[in-house]
Amino acid sequence: MLSGCSAQQDEQVTINVYNWGQYISEGDDGCIDVIAEFEAAYPNIKVNYVTFDSNETMYTKMAGGGITVDVIIPSDYMVGRLAQEGMLLPLNFENIPNAQFVDQRFQNPSYDPENKYSVPYSWGTVGIIYNTKYVDEEDVTGWEILWNENAAGEQLDYAGKILMFDNSRDAFAIAQCRLGYSMNTTDEQELLECAKLLEQQRPVVQQYIMDQVFDLMENEEAWIAPYYAGDYLTMSGENEDLAFYLPGDQGFNLFVDAMCIPTCCENQEAAETFINFLCDPEIAGGNMDWICYSTPISAAKEFMELDEEMESINYPSGDFLDKGTSYLPMPRETTRYVDNLFMRVRNGISLEKEPGSEVLVWAAVIVAVAAIAGAAFLLLRKRKKK
């Protein structure tokens, strides 16, 4: 469990940072060790670093209560949701002067007008990672390859080697791109059609994944996966046969991950000091060099070692980025509806059944078993009396 910390800035304090896995430079390969550098710069503040693998995992733990977290780094739509639900503290930007370095493009976003609750940490795109040893590049023309199909609807030979997101928002976004729907639709009929498309995909999917994608793709246990561009660059460093495709014609998710302070924080000033440190251009540049994501701070790029591939994948042209869509927070009832549909798809529960029908079936079985057991018990008692 995440522990608490003292609220006294002039005393030794510990801040609990809750972030994605493999999402901060740890000093490997000659890169900066961000946390070690921070603790050296601020000897009275120690960092307890804990990771999550999806926004939904993070939200569930935060909403459950009973923990203390000082800094979290959720994605754009989750920032909006947490703010709407009163789970974030307004930031005191007097303690975050380095926020001035954030590019204009990332200021005043729709998910957090005026950046009241967040400071951008990184940004990126979602595309298709594939292994050129096993996958014909001519087959990779759009999201349909994740259904083991080409653009003409013909079956391919990659069934069982395809991975899919294990979170509802990213999985539904891909289906929405295929069907031509908005990634932010709240129309239940459109969402049901997306779920049915994902249900059709299930037989060709090897696994639903998040962080497992690294080992599976690097070790060639899987050949095709949708994932984040920055993580592709990390994986391609381990397996040079991996390639990346961004389906611009169909659309893709353009996301921002941002630093926030939740209401369960016990030392806001120390938390803001940490956020400010991460916004220093030199620190941000060194950090992004290791995690391979795009920085929202252009001044940081002069401290980065960007090769041609990193530049083209992490910093597409503005015209191309305009084809991407950012997630917006959805109403709570829509989120529940989508989560329920996705749970049924990934667990192989037919969408033709009424929601909850599988529970009723099991309840009927339990009642029947109990009735049989009760009858047997009564019969046994009668025999004993005889």
Language-model features: where?
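Early extracytoplasmic/lumenal segment of secretory-pathway proteins
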Residues: D10-R81
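Extracytoplasmic ligand-binding site segments that recognize negatively charged/polar headgroups
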Residues: Y18-C31, T68, I73-V204, I209-E218
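Paired acidic/hydrophobic, glycine-rich loop segments that form the ligand-binding mouth/hinge
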Residues: D70-I73, Q206-Q207, W223-Y228, A243-F244
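A ligand-binding cleft/hinge motif common to bilobed small-molecule-binding domains
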Residues: M78-R81, I224-D241
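Periplasmic-binding protein-like
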Residues: F101, G124, L191-Q200, N239-T263
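Conserved C-terminal helix/tail region of periplasmic/extracytoplasmic solute-binding proteins
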Residues: D215, D319-K386
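Mature extracytoplasmic/periplasmic domains
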Residues: P262-S326
